[in-house]
A protein has these predicted regions:
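Active-site residues of response regulator receiver
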Residues: 57, 85
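Alpha4 helix (beta4-alpha4-beta5 surface) of REC/receiver domains from two-component response regulators
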Residues: 67, 88-104, 111, 115
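Acidic catalytic/metal-coordinating carboxylates
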Residues: 35-38, 63-67
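Receiver (REC) domain active-site loop signature in two-component systems and cognate sites
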Residues: 60
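Short amphipathic alpha-helix used as the core "switch/output" element in two-component signaling
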Residues: 41, 66-77
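Two-component/phosphorelay signaling modules centered on CheY-like receiver
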Residues: 13-31
């Protein structure tokens, strides 16, 4: 286990469960949010730091992943946010990078997410 906390931000409960299963042995604590608004509040409340990771979906009801990433990074510049999405598109990758994401992984490649977390 790596000494980090993971915050999973995903509106689909089954996908949240799948992501949790893939990364569960890599973190000392895992929490979940269903939208970007919850994620911004949870990041501050849990006092997450540079050693921790946020796994953020892009499209969610209410505040989406890009806006939540911008808000978290504005308040916490050291926040490490990895986008986990179904969109394999340069537009989304560029937008995620501009919002402050440090990584971008497709949901179909969750083993790549594990490698990214291990190699942090």
């Amino acid at each position: 286990m790596i000494e980090m906390k993971i915050l999973i931000v995903e509106d689909n409960p089954q996908m949240r469960q799948l992501i949790r299963a893939v990364v569960s042995d890599l973190a000392e604590a895992i929490s979940e949010c269903a939208d970007g608004e919850e994620a911004v509040a949870a990041y501050a409340a849990q006092q997450l730091g540079a050693e921790d990771r946020v796994l953020m979906d892009l499209q969610m009801p209410g505040v989406g992943g890009l806006e939540a990433t911008r808000r978290i990074r504005a308040a916490f510049p050291d926040a490490q946010i990895i986008i986990v999405t179904q969109f394999d598109d340069q537009h989304w990758r560029r937008a995620a990078s501009e919002a402050g994401a440090c990584g971008y992984v497709l949901k179909e490649n969750l083993l790549e997410l594990r490698q990214m977390l291990i190699g942090r």
